[in-house]
Amino acid sequence: MQAVALEQALKRHYARNQRWGFIWAIWMAVLWGAWYVPGTALWFEHPYVDIPANATALRLTATAVMTWVHAIGVFVWLLLWNGTLGKIRDYGRTMVRFRRISKWYALASLCGGPMAIFGSYMAMTYAGPVFAAISSLLFPVVGTVIAALWFKERITRRAALGMSIVILGGLAVYGPGLFGQLQSTQSDAWLGYAGGIMSALGWGAEGAVAARAMDVSDPDVGIQCRFSFEVFFWGLLILPALTFFTDIPVARLLVDTLANGRALLWIFLAASTHAYCYTSWYKATSLIGVSRTGGIGNLYAMLALIFIACFTLQLPAWYFLIGLALSITGSFVMFGESAESVASLRDVTSGNQAMVEAE
């Protein structure tokens, strides 16, 4: 009787984890999709709208400035979140344990901030918000491969099939642009494609690294640590280096941004959606793993298209829709597993050995 009761309790536990993991992943998709609207609108405000299209170095520096201000906004929203939950002390304790815990969040911030978020802003600028939203669809594949090779997260045949479909969707998005079928009026459109690749690789790597960190820390606290490091990297390393070693007016861009109320409004909205999108992402990853969270999170692209179309009244090109349909289909294939399949996310023996070696 006790064995039967234990088995039933475990099934309920697995089902609850899967259900809440699914719910958090859906919220991640909704908020991520919404982020592309204010993230794109910011480029139509002073000082960014005044930057000439051919001033590549200045535009990239402006992207770095807005990414830093955005990271500060996300940090403030997360501070409010953790303050409400009473986890500020946990945040402090986690930050000071750099060797064992917070070093992983520092690495995640490098993957997610200077690489992924910066790359996504580049894609919005040089290739448009629709391309930026859909090009990141490959990030679950990147995250799943890293998680499988690093700490042996299990990949079922169904998950592998889903990833293959997502890859086809990504090829459908990139193909026309790579072969010259995307008629862009910007000579620097390749920077948009590079930004899309950066966002996919960066967010995929961040998902795997964050999953490693959440083995020994709380997701709410972890995401606060991650953005703390991003604020540090941009504000104390990258932007000061640009200020001292180039003649680009970094300080003027920052002052003009902070002095423009409408620019701050868009940053405020973008930071609020991204803060709780990231919170949902980390919570879902801790419950259902890197691959499944990324698979369901890919719904953000469909939602981004809806949000962008509502605000711009413009529909995307046909090949974007093909890539979107394939990627969304692959996402549902990846998630369509039983609750018991999610019960053991990793090959525990070899996974623990890999983590020990990483220490």
What is the predicted function of each stretch?
Residues 1-68, 183-212, 350-359:
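Glycine-/small-residue-enriched transmembrane alpha-helix faces in small-molecule transporters
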Residues 2-7, 158-177, 298, 307, ...:
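Hydrophobic transmembrane alpha-helices of multi-pass small-molecule transport proteins
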Residues 19, 23, 27-30, 56-84, ...:
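Hydrophobic alpha-helical transmembrane segments of multi-pass integral membrane proteins
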Residues 27, 113-117, 129-138, 166, ...:
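Helix-helix packing/entry segments at the starts of transmembrane helices
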Residues 31-34, 91-130, 172, 270-288:
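Specific transmembrane alpha-helical segments of multi-pass solute transporters/efflux pumps
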Residues 42, 66, 123, 149-155, ...:
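Hydrophobic/aromatic residues within transmembrane alpha-helices
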Residues 43-58, 175-188, 243-259, 314-316:
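Membrane-interface helix termini and inter-helical loops of multi-pass transporters
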Residues 55, 140-164, 302-321:
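C-terminal transmembrane-helix exit sites in multi-pass transporters
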